[in-house]
Regions:
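Short amphipathic, positively biased membrane-proximal segments
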Residues: 1-142
Length: 142
């Protein structure tokens, strides 16, 4: 991976590692925020009822995969794990479509779109081929 790829991985992965660690250490506020979305998801997916446990597990995934991406360890796998954890995080954490107040709605929409951009970056990393491998993306991780 070139210097820009390493720097990008460090910045992208590092932010997930920091926020994930915070979720593992103190899940209460995030669990409360995620509660309504988790109840909706439970209608179609059998999830444990312990919202704090789910927040901690998600935080652990983000911590581990974020740290791995930050140091360049298994970047494609790490990026896929982060992408998989970011989708429910974004849905639960930034439901701008449910907010009446225009200022709060705009702020949550901004955070939702920021997460969507991060998801895009993760998908670019995940889709990057190994040096010499054909991936169809035109992007090489090596």
């Amino acid at each position: 991976m070139n210097i820009l790829g390493r720097l990008g991985g460090a910045l992208l992965g590092g932010s997930f590692a920091v926020f994930g660690y915070g979720a593992v250490r103190d899940p209460a506020a995030l669990a409360k925020l995620a509660g309504p979305a988790l109840e909706e998801i439970r209608k179609v997916v059998p999830l444990p009822k312990d919202d704090e446990l789910l927040v901690r597990v998600n935080g652990a995934v983000q911590t581990g995969a974020g740290a791995a991406l930050a140091i360049g360890l298994f970047p494609r796998t790490s990026a896929l794990a982060l992408a998989g954890s970011l989708i429910p995080t974004t849905y639960a954490g930034h439901p701008f479509w449910t907010i009446e107040d225009p200022a709060q709605r705009k702020a949550q929409r901004t955070q939702f779109l920021k997460n969507a951009a991060m998801l895009g970056g993760l998908l670019v990393v995940a889709g990057a081929g190994r040096k010499g491998a054909a991936s169809g993306t035109g992007i090489s991780a090596g």
